[in-house]
Amino acid sequence: MDLIDTHQHLILRDRVGYGWTADIPALATGDFTEADYAGLTAGKGVVGQVFMETGVDDADYQAEARLIAERVGTGGFLGQIASIRPETDAGFDAWLEEAQGLGTVGFRRILHVVPDDVSTTDRFRANLRKIGRAGYPFDLNFLSRQLIPVG
C-alpha cells in the first residue's frame, strides 16, 4: 500500500532555530535531514510527504516555510503546513498571501506555547476566517487543558 506522510518534520539548524529542543537531550543537537527521513522510510511504502512546520523560533517561521517551498514538488514533497500568527495583524495579510505561493496546503499555530487566551481574541478569530476564505485549513495544536469543555 502506498502511504503519504502528512506530518513530516525536519530539523535544519544551519537555516532556522529550534529553541524548544534545548531541553530534550535526543533533539538538543544535530539535524534531522531529508536523507535521514529517506533512510527511515525506505521500503515502508511512503511515496510522498506533507511537511509540518516544526515550531521554529518565532523569528524564523517564515524562513522555514520559504526553505521548504524550495523542496515542494521534488523528492516526494507534496506541500507544507506552514506556521502563521493569527493573533497579530502586523504582517498577517502579507504572510497569508505570500505563503499561498510556497506550496502551502494549510496553516498551523502551536497554541500551547502562548497564553491560553490568545485564541479567544476577536483578532485571532477574524484572521482564522481569512485563512478559511482563502481556502486553507487551520491546524489547532493545543494541550487538553486548553480545550473548553463541551456539552
Where are these regions (language model features)?
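Active-site gating/metal-coordination segments in enzymes
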Residues: 62-146
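An N-terminally biased module of ancient metal coordination in phosphate/nucleic-acid-related enzymes
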Residues: 1-70, 100
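A short acidic (Asp/Glu
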Residues: 61, 150-151
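Single-residue recognition of alpha-helix boundary sites
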Residues: 16-18, 75, 150
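Alpha-helical scaffolding within the catalytic cores
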Residues: 29-38, 91-94, 147-150
